[in-house]
Regions:
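S-adenosyl-L-methionine
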Residues: 80-105
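A short acidic, Gly/Pro-enriched loop at the edge of an enzyme's catalytic core
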Residues: 103-114
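A short glycine-rich, Lys/Arg-flanked "PGG" loop and its adjoining helix->strand segment in the class I
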Residues: 125-139
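Short loop/turn segments that connect beta-strands within beta-propeller blades
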Residues: 266-268, 307-310
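Repeat-blade elements of multi-bladed beta-propeller folds
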Residues: 229-261, 277-304, 317, 321-326
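Conserved class I S-adenosyl-L-methionine
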Residues: 42-61, 67
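Conserved beta-strand signature within the Rossmann-like core of class I S-adenosyl-L-methionine
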Residues: 139-147
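Blade/loop signatures of beta-propeller domains
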Residues: 193-219, 257
């Protein structure tokens, strides 16, 4: 009897372990993380993965500059993912796993750049589209799907579309060898205004038309750099802020951040890109224009055009026959 009991206990333990780690045990198709990152439209920022999918979460952290936050109600699965991340050399600054429910996500409104869930069949009963949209930043994207649905692919697809069917979103669905997926994008923030120039606009009238930020004023995020040099100029457009830091430091802690452009998410503070300014660059002037697509800056005898999301050079503007250094 003791042998039978021991055998039964071992079988039960194996079944429980397999159920807890079933998704993680199935290797993800090659390139799935790239497809999801492409559909999500971001490489830096904050990505929330709902439900443990260890292999996918680790690949997302490795192949991007995203901070990946994984949330799952099962403590055993969370502990297992932490161990796998530690063994893979992926630290907490790149991937953090937390145990908790999904009905109320632990994120402030308008915070997360990308939300991914690959176990829709298990999660849809716990997760609402309204809660996902609340946590997403404006124009942020959620990709919800079922990996390896097998013969239930059609049924899974129908459930996903029904789950995401909201009047203010236009879901996009696709099926591929990796599974069935649906993508929803949060609408832009109504009433939000840009601050494209040093004094708000080209007319130098520093009055915002923003209808969103109202008293009582609350902190949206705290993020590095916490200390900057001076002078400094901030412009904002398309949900991003562009901080230009000058040449003066009053403390050692500010040295490394002098003469620099720092582009950050206006919703969660994550640094999207940085660019060193030339020695002697004068920051305290109207040298920058921020738009949703392009960041313009004076650079010697030209105007440099940078991709607002990545900081990559897009081109330049020169005035024929005009020479000078601004």
């Amino acid at each position: 009897m003791k042998k039978i009991s021991a055998l039964s206990t071992g079988i039960m333990a194996a079944v429980v372990f397999a159920a807890t780690n079933s998704v993680s045990a199935n290797p993800i198709p090659q390139g799935l993380e790239e497809r999801l990152l492409e559909e999500g439209g971001v490489r830096r920022g904050i990505c929330a993965v709902l439900g443990i999918d260890a292999d996918l979460s680790l690949r997302l952290a490795r192949e991007s500059g995203l901070l990946v936050h994984v949330r799952d109600p099962r403590p055993g699965a969370v502990l297992d993912l932490r161990k796998q991340a530690d063994q893979a050399g992926v630290g907490i600054r790149r991937l953090a796993a937390e145990q908790g429910g999904l009905k109320a996500l632990p994120y402030a409104d308008n915070t997360i750049d990308l939300i991914i869930a690959s176990q829709a069949n298990e999660l849809l009963g716990q997760l609402s589209a309204a809660e996902v949209l609340r946590a997403l930043r404006p124009e942020g994207i959620a990709i919800i799907g079922q990996r390896d649905p097998g013969s239930d692919a059609r049924e899974s697809s129908q459930k996903l579309e029904a789950w995401a069917d909201r009047g203010d979103t236009k879901p996009a669905a696709w099926n591929d060898p990796s599974g069935v997926w649906i993508k929803i994008q949060k609408p832009p923030l109504k009433g939000a205004d840009n601050w494209s120039h040093w004094e708000k606009g080209p007319d130098n009238n520093p009055v915002s038309r923003d209808q969103v930020i109202k008293a009582p004023y609350m902190t949206q995020f705290m993020a590095n750099p916490l200390y900057i040099g001076m002078p400094s100029i901030t412009t904002a457009a398309g949900g991003r802020t562009f901080l230009a830091v000058g040449h003066i430091a009053h403390h050692r802690r500010e040295w490394d951040g002098l003469l620099r452009i720092i582009a950050r998410s206006g919703y969660n503070g994550k640094v999207l890109w940085e660019r060193k300014l030339p020695q002697g660059y004068l920051v305290h002037r109207s040298a920058f224009i921020a738009t949703k697509e392009t960041f313009y800056m004076i650079d010697g005898d030209r105007c440099l055009m940078l991709d607002a999301q990545t900081g990559n050079e897009q081109g330049e503007i020169r005035i024929p026959g005009v020479k000078g250094d601004w």
